[in-house]
Each structure stands twice: as structure tokens, then as C-alpha cells.
């Protein structure tokens, strides 16, 4: 009888999280709001823009016997559908194109990171800040 009670208790405890909330414990991969610093070499200003980026949890696995078997591909939260918007930087000298484009995430998914189009993570040497004086982002095209 004690074994049956223990099994029932284990089942109830393991299902408790599903009753408490329908949301996952970790936020899944999805578009989120973000503020980016936009600047261009040759232009004396930096403008912040509000956009959406892909962020969130993607389930991954790793092998226990890594030396025997090849590594499993690791997935990251990355863009599925994206559009590009442009902003005009004031004060750029003649000969420097003042238009800068940036991505706006429309939808995201868990997939392999494409280094050709994405920052695949890892530690950063410096925070994402401006090198030039900052202006509010008011100059959209």
C-alpha cells in the first residue's frame, strides 16, 4: 500500500507544473522587442531604433560519449521571416551613404545558426553601445 501511495504522490508532483501554468517554464523562441544602436563608419552620430529580434529557449541535446560519436548539431533561436527597415543618419559627409538598414523579426524558429546572416552567440568583447554621440531615432525612411 505504501508503494502505491508513493507512486501516486510522485505522479501528482510531476503533473503539478502543468496545472499551475499553461506557459512553459522557459520562454520559447519568439520575436521580442529590442532597442539597437545604429551607426555607420564615416557618420558622426549614433541613433537608437526599436525593432524585434529573435530570442528564447530552444531545446538541445549533447552526447554523453562525445569522444566516440560525432557531436549533435546545436540549434539556436533564429529568424524565420524577416523584413528590413532603413534609417537615415544625419550629418554624414558627402560620399558616405547615410542610409543604414536593419532586420525586423516577423517570426522565429529553432534552427541551425547561419553565420552568414546571424550572430551565433558567444561572449562579446564590449557591450552594444555607440562610439559616436547618440540621437533619438526619429529619421526613418
Curated annotation (Swiss-Prot):
Disulphide bonds in the chain? 29-77, 43-92, 46-130, 54-108, 58-110, 113-120
Please state the protein's primary subcellular location: secreted
List the GO biological process terms: G protein-coupled receptor signaling pathway
Q: Which UniProt keywords apply?
A: Disulfide bond, Glycoprotein, Hormone, Secreted, Signal
Q: Which domain of life is it from?
A: Eukaryota
Instruction: Tell me where in or outside the cell this protein is found.
Output: Secreted
Annotated GO molecular function terms are: hormone activity
GO CC annotation terms, alphabetical: cytoplasm; extracellular space
PROSITE patterns named among the record's database cross-references: GLYCO_HORMONE_BETA_1, GLYCO_HORMONE_BETA_2
Write the signal peptide boundaries: 1-20
The residues that carry sugar chains are 33, 50
CDD domains found in the cross-reference section: GHB_like
Which PANTHER family does the entry link to?
Answer: CHORIOGONADOTROPIN SUBUNIT BETA 3-RELATED, GLYCOPROTEIN HORMONE BETA CHAIN
Family note = Belongs to the glycoprotein hormones subunit beta family.
Q: What's the stated role of this polypeptide?
A: Promotes spermatogenesis and ovulation by stimulating the testes and ovaries to synthesize steroids.
Quaternary organization: Heterodimer of a common alpha chain and a unique beta chain which confers biological specificity to thyrotropin, lutropin, follitropin and gonadotropin.
Record protein name field: Lutropin subunit beta
The source organism is Pongo pygmaeus
